[in-house]
Every structure is written in structure tokens, then in C-alpha cells.
């Protein structure tokens, strides 16, 4: 149960600015299936899941239109995402025989690869400039794979890790929690959906109809938390087209459902069987708890996803330190 888990604040290092910290370029540490034990015992895993759960608690019962603080750091992150969006417009798909995986994506990605540190430097204050190369790696990892032209939950996790790192160095703070999900992550989703559509990206490691979604997972977790104790919307309503059309602008979960129905044809129960099953769960709190368990089992504990995760000084591979 999410409420019962310890939830370290996302900016637990705020009291001690990491000026003297030795930042490093993150690298892969999970090379074989037996290495997964190292990941599950790591400080990185504890901090990552703690971050996800803290945000889950922060958005509980709140609409996207809820009033919350938007800090300068959040505004700068939105400007960064606007830049990525603009680059898509400047890099149209090329004519090619294959329907999927448009090669223009590689041109778009090469620009990000080149500019990532500059983009992150514009978000991070000058006294934390040493952190930029480390943090920028997670941004580059969060937009898909340029070799395979695919995108999946591992890339989404890299963006959450990027935000977690910004919290750990104090760029984002406790009172940014709601804006992190409703503003920054929501804008990230818009840009990723545009990438997926424009370049016909393949789903990375998709489980087909048996997976939750081809591309995302976190907006279903945070989106179900938003709907906890809703006066009239119940899980059974998200398969109702009218309910989705009338409420998707307020709830991430319903926005995800709308995107799926736009992208897929045929009966919902056939193309999205897992979600169809979830619509039978009686309450949003049960949906939320079940999705957190499923995220751990299907994403965070799966070697094909975690083998690509990178570890540095902010999200370290060493075992959890008590205290």
C-alpha cells in the first residue's frame, strides 16, 4: 500500500547544498539478470521509488486545473520542453519505404545530444554548474532510442530520474511537487506523444495487448491518484467515451485513455485488455495501489528495462545507507 511506504522528500539534500559533491557521468551498472539484486538494494532504487510515491501523494484528489505554485525552475523546465517541441516542427519526417521508425528522428535526437548540456545549464543555477553533465544524461535518455527509433517506460523512467536529480540538488523543491507532475511531466508527455506520432516510433519492449500501454506508465499512477475520492467518476467510467471527452483536460489518466483511443482501432477490450480489466476495480485508491505494484513488477523489476538505467553520484548503485 502506497501510504504505508516511507516516502523520503524529493529534495532531501536541500539542507546541505551539494557544492562539494563529486558529480560523475552516469553509466550502466546492471549488465546481467543477477545484477538486478544490486538495483533493488540500491540507493538509486530507494530514492527513485520514494520520489514517485511522494508525487503520487502530492497530486491525490487534485484536478490539473488546481491552483498551485509555479516556480522559476518549473518555468525554465517548460521552456526546455518547448524547445524540444519546436525542434520536432523544424525536423519533418522524411520519405522512406518503412512505415515505422522515421529516420528524421535521428536528426532530431542528434540536436538534443549536442545541445542537452546547454539546455540543462539554463535550468540549473551557476553555483551548481558542475552537476550539469551528470543531470543532462538523464534528459538525453528520456526521449527514446535513436538506433532503434523506439520509446518505452525505461525512457519515461529516465525523465522521472532527471526530475529526481533536480530535486536532489535543490533546483526543484518540496513546494514544486504538484507543478512537477501537472506542469513539467504533463508537458513532457505532450512532447513525447508528438515524437511518437511524428516519427512513428516503435514501442520499446511492448507487451502488446497484455501491457498497460505501449509507451507510458507513470501518468496512469499519478492520474489514478488524482481521481481518488472523486464525487462521481469511478474506474468503470474511463471506458465510457463521453466521460473521457468531458473530463480528460482535468485528469492525466483520462488524457492517456483519449490518446490510446486516437491511436488504436477496434474494441477497447481487445487493444487494451489490461486497462479494460482495471476498469472493473471498485475504487481509484485500489487502482492506484495496484498500478504501483504493477509498475514495480513490470517495469522496475524487469531486466530488459533496467539494463539501460544509468547510475551516478545523485542516483548511486551503492546499497541504501540507513539514517
From Swiss-Prot:
Which residues take part in binding Mg(2+)? 208, 214
Q: Does the keyword Cytoplasm apply?
A: yes
Top-level EC class as recorded in UniProt: isomerase
Q: Which domain of life is it from?
A: Eukaryota
Q: In which tissues is it expressed?
A: Widely expressed.
Q: What is its EC number?
A: 5.2.1.8
Where is ATP annotated to bind?
148, 153-154, 304, 307-308
Q: Which reaction does it catalyse?
A: [protein]-peptidylproline (omega=180) = [protein]-peptidylproline (omega=0)
Region feature Disordered, mapped onto this chain: 1-21
The modified positions for N-acetylalanine read: 2
GO CC, any one term: nucleus
Q: Which family does it belong to?
A: Belongs to the PTPA-type PPIase family.
Question: What exactly does this protein do?
Answer: PPIases accelerate the folding of proteins. It catalyzes the cis-trans isomerization of proline imidic peptide bonds in oligopeptides. Acts as a regulatory subunit for serine/threonine-protein phosphatase 2A (PP2A). Modulates PP2A activity or substrate specificity, probably by inducing a conformational change in the catalytic subunit, a proposed direct target of the PPIase. Can reactivate inactive phosphatase PP2A-phosphatase methylesterase complexes (PP2A(i)) in presence of ATP and Mg(2+).
Quaternary structure (record): Associates with the serine/threonine-protein phosphatase 2A PP2A(D) heterodimeric core enzyme, composed of a 36 kDa catalytic subunit (subunit C) and a 65 kDa constant regulatory subunit (PR65 or subunit A). Interacts with the catalytic subunit PPP2CA (via C-terminus). Interacts with PPP2CB.
The protein here is known as: Serine/threonine-protein phosphatase 2A activator
- Which gene is this protein's source? PTPA
Amino acid at each position: 500500500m502506497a501510504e504505508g511506504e516511507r516516502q523520503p522528500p524529493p529534495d532531501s539534500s536541500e539542507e546541505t547544498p551539494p557544492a562539494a559533491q563529486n558529480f560523475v557521468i552516469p553509466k550502466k551498472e546492471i549488465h546481467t539478470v543477477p545484477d538486478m539484486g544490486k538495483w533493488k538494494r540500491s540507493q538509486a532504487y530507494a530514492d527513485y521509488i520514494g520520489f514517485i510515491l511522494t508525487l503520487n501523494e502530492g497530486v491525490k484528489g487534485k484536478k490539473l486545473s488546481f491552483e498551485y505554485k509555479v516556480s522559476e525552475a518549473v518555468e525554465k523546465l517548460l521552456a526546455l520542453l518547448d524547445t524540444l517541441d519546436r525542434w520536432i516542427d523544424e525536423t519533418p519526417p522524411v520519405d522512406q519505404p518503412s512505415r515505422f521508425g522515421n529516420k528524421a528522428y535521428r536528426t532530431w535526437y542528434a540536436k538534443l545530444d549536442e545541445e542537452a548540456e546547454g539546455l540543462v545549464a539554463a535550468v540549473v543555477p551557476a553555483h551548481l554548474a558542475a552537476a550539469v553533465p551528470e543531470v543532462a544524461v538523464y534528459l538525453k535518455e528520456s526521449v527514446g532510442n535513436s538506433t532503434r527509433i523506439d520509446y518505452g517506460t525505461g525512457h519515461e523512467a529516465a525523465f522521472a530520474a532527471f526530475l529526481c536529480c533536480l530535486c536532489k540538488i535543490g533546483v526543484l523543491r518540496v513546494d514544486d511537487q504538484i507543478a512537477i507532475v501537472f506542469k513539467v511531466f504533463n508537458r513532457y508527455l505532450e512532447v513525447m506523444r508528438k515524437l511518437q506520432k511524428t516519427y512513428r516510433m516503435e514501442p520499446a519492449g511492448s507487451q502488446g495487448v497484455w501491457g498497460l500501454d505501449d509507451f507510458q506508465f507513470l501518468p496512469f499512477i499519478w492520474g489514478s491518484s488524482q481521481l481518488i475520492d472523486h464525487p462521481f467518476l469511478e474506474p468503470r467510467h474511463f471506458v465510457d467515451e463521453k466521460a473521457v471527452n468531458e473530463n480528460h483536460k482535468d485528469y492525466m489518466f483520462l488524457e492517456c485513455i483519449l490518446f490510446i483511443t486516437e491511436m488504436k482501432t477496434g474494441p477497447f477490450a481487445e487493444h487494451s485488455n489490461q486497462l479494460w480489466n482495471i476498469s472493473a476495480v471498485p475504487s481509484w485508491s485500489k487502482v492506484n495501489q495496484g498500478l504501483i505494484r504493477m509498475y514495480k513488477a513490470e517495469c522496475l523489476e524487469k531486466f530488459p528495462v533496467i539494463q539501460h538505467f544509468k547510475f551516478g553520484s545523485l542516483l548511486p548503485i551503492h546499497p541504501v545507507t540507513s539514517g
